From Swiss-Prot:
The gene is rpsT. It comes from Desulfosudis oleivorans (strain DSM 6200 / JCM 39069 / Hxd3) (Desulfococcus oleovorans). It holds the Pfam family Ribosomal_S20p. It comes from the Bacteria. Binds directly to 16S ribosomal RNA. GO terms for biological process: translation. Keywords: Ribonucleoprotein, Ribosomal protein, RNA-binding, rRNA-binding. GO terms for cellular component: cytosol; small ribosomal subunit. Residues 1-10 have a biased composition (Basic residues). This is Small ribosomal subunit protein bS20.
Length: 88
């Protein structure tokens, strides 16, 4: 365990940030799986509406620095391609 006051504070902040980031990443994985499940079921309209929510969540998470901006863009792009392919 940390001995200095500043390192104790840092350790506490790390725990809080770790928890927050883990929650955000879990939400991203969940909504991605939800979109994929809707695509697999053939529910194209539901998949499109869920895709919009997923895009918003990816952009917000990237803006907060939990994931990189280009990672968010890549994942949104791949999700969009899957949804568009299912709509055809």
């Amino acid at each position: 365990m940390a001995n200095h006051k500043s390192s104790l504070k840092r350790a506490k902040q790390d725990i809080v940030r770790n928890t927050r980031n883990k929650s955000r990443k879990t939400a991203l994985k969940t909504i991605t799986k939800k979109v994929d499940a809707l695509v697999a079921d053939g529910a194209a309209e539901d998949a499109k509406t869920t895709l919009l929510a997923a895009q918003k969540l990816f952009d917000q998470t990237a803006a907060k620095g939990t994931i990189h901006k280009k990672t968010a863009s890549r994942k949104i792009s791949r999700l969009t391609r899957r949804v568009n392919a299912a709509a055809k």
